From Swiss-Prot:
Residues 93-105 have a biased composition (Low complexity). This is Shiftless antiviral inhibitor of ribosomal frameshifting protein homolog. Residues 82-91 have a biased composition (Basic and acidic residues). Its main location: cytoplasm.
Length: 327
């Protein structure tokens, strides 16, 4: 395994461990534990949630192990820089308005005897007894990071994408301009839609938008979509195309159905291209950071741009570029 790939894998495990405890675990400690237990964030998270014993910080042996581990040091420096940058941004906005782990970093006996895990369990267990904290421990023990899939769209770069993000941190960064965005509002989403006709009970899929009606392929009734579906890579597989050509009541639809609705726009890529309109139908709101969250496992931080795919593939990001443009 190359040193760069090793750093990526270590970073992913550290981000996952910290996300399970909402960023309450220090970066140094998280990196040390992931090196010690071969990036097994599931096991470590479970033991932290179960532990309640003494209280201590990193001892000299642990600190020496990190100092002699270049991979761990690089990950620590990167994550700390991200955290510091986030804190500086928050403070500014408020004021204005290949080496492996060293021998000492290897696992010490069992997790139940690990002082670092014990210390974390003790410190986290004295948190106030709230529903949110209880939910955090329950989810950590069950190896869960609650997440949802959302559509994002960058107006300045004219691109849209789908991403699975934590429920507590619904934000995604555009890979081109690096700006952070909130999800497209649910009532403004567009793309491959799923329809259920209340008149003929027909179920079908086609391009649509949540705030616009499309004709049923069966009875031609004008109906709203039930939901917008994330594109699937399997749509790129060769095979017969759908029998029904796209058609809607939008004024500028390339295959318009009458009576059309004046002033409405078609979201089908053919119509957008024919009418020389931007790809993005409704842009994401710009994300305003509260400074209350950290860059964790499902955030868009990466070692370098070319390494992004390793992390994105791991969390199954799906881009509209991967979808079939026909309906």
């Amino acid at each position: 395994m190359s040193r760069m790939h090793e750093e990526v894998e270590l970073e992913k495990s550290v981000r996952r461990l910290r996300e399970k405890f909402h960023g309450l675990i220090e970066i140094d400690t998280a990196v040390l534990l992931m090196r010690r237990y071969v990036k097994n964030h599931r096991m470590v998270a479970m033991w932290i949630a179960l532990m309640a014993d003494n209280d201590r910080e990193l001892d000299e042996e642990d600190q020496a192990a990190l100092n002699n581990d270049p991979v761990a040091k690089n990950v620590i420096m990167k994550l700390k820089a991200e955290e510091q940058q986030q804190e500086e941004k928050h403070a500014k906005s408020s004021s204005s308005g290949s080496s492996g782990a060293g021998p000492s970093a290897k696992a010490k006996k069992q997790p139940s005897d690990d002082r670092d895990i014990t210390e974390l369990g003790t410190r986290l267990r004295v948190l106030p007894l709230t529903m949110e904290n209880k939910r955090m421990f329950d989810q950590a023990q069950a190896n869960q990071i609650p997440s949802d899939t959302h559509q994002f769209a960058c107006e300045s770069c004219d691109r849209d994408w789908w991403r699975r993000v934590p429920q507590r941190k619904r934000v995604s960064r555009c890979h081109r301009c690096k700006k952070k965005n909130d999800p497209v509002p649910p009532d403004r989403m567009w793309g491959i839609a799923e329809f259920t006709c209340p008149n003929c009970t027909r179920n079908f899929k086609g391009f649509g938008r949540m705030d616009g009606r499309s004709p049923c392929y069966g009875c031609r009734s004008a109906i709203y979509p039930m939901k917008i579906l994330p594109p699937r890579r399997k749509n790129m597989m060769p095979g017969p195309k759908q029998r029904n050509q796209h058609s809607c009541f939008a004024e500028d639809c390339y295959h318009r159905m009458e009576p059309h609705v004046p002033g409405t726009e078609c979201v089908h890529p053919h119509s957008r291209q024919k009418n020389r309109k931007p790809r993005v139908v409704y842009p994401s709101p710009a994300h305003i950071s509260s400074g209350s969250t950290v860059n964790t496992c499902l955030s868009q931080g990466s070692l370098i741009e070319s390494i992004n795919e390793l992390i994105l593939d791991d969390i199954e990001e799906e881009s509209e570029d991967d979808s079939d443009s026909s309906s």
